[in-house]
């Protein structure tokens, strides 16, 4: 089983990203779970969402405390949240950032085995005209992890967002897929 934890801020689409990733894996014949963790969040407050993907039925119903993959939609969270808390040995961190590998590693409390970086915000601004990074970061997830194919991500995005909005979001995911840099540490 692969367990993914998303860290974002209210209004950035972390919950939608977790759901779209689950749908992409489902389209590939996997068993999936996706769910948010809500406190008294408001727009801009830290939000956590989760996705589980497996080849067999998933019976666990708890939050993900020891993720294989951590996805950070908002790089400012690296200063306030321990995004690597519980990260499994051999785990991966995927960050939306324009910073260098060294700058990001300085902010992580635990060094991951792999680090993937992409400037998902710039991609979202260029393609969507908004700094909503949830679909672009999924392109990075597809490239860095290989959990799902980028084509499945694009299809799941188009299932979630209709018409031109779906096409633009799928394009943002593809662009991030192509621009993501993965480091073995």
UniProtKB/Swiss-Prot annotation:
Q: What is this protein called?
A: Pyruvate/ketoisovalerate oxidoreductases common subunit gamma
Q: Which cysteines are joined by disulfide bonds?
A: none
Q: What is known about its subunit structure?
A: Heterotetramer of one alpha, one beta, one delta and one gamma chain.
Task: List, alphabetically, the SUPFAM superfamilies matched.
Answer: Pyruvate-ferredoxin oxidoreductase, PFOR, domain III
A molecular function annotated in GO for this UniProt entry is: pyruvate synthase activity
| UniProt organism field | Thermococcus litoralis (strain ATCC 51850 / DSM 5473 / JCM 8560 / NS-C)
Instruction: Identify the EC number(s).
Output: 1.2.7.1, 1.2.7.7
Q: Which reaction does it catalyse?
A: 2 oxidized [2Fe-2S]-[ferredoxin] + pyruvate + CoA = 2 reduced [2Fe-2S]-[ferredoxin] + acetyl-CoA + CO2 + H(+); 3-methyl-2-oxobutanoate + 2 oxidized [2Fe-2S]-[ferredoxin] + CoA = 2-methylpropanoyl-CoA + 2 reduced [2Fe-2S]-[ferredoxin] + CO2 + H(+)
The protein's superkingdom reads Archaea
Q: Which UniProt keywords apply?
A: Oxidoreductase
Family annotation (InterPro entries): Oxidoreductase_gamma_subunit (IPR051626), PorC_KorC (IPR011894), Pyrv/ketoisovalerate_OxRed_cat (IPR019752), Pyrv_flavodox_OxRed_cen (IPR002869)
Class of this enzyme:
oxidoreductase
- Pfam families (UniProt xref): POR (PF01558)
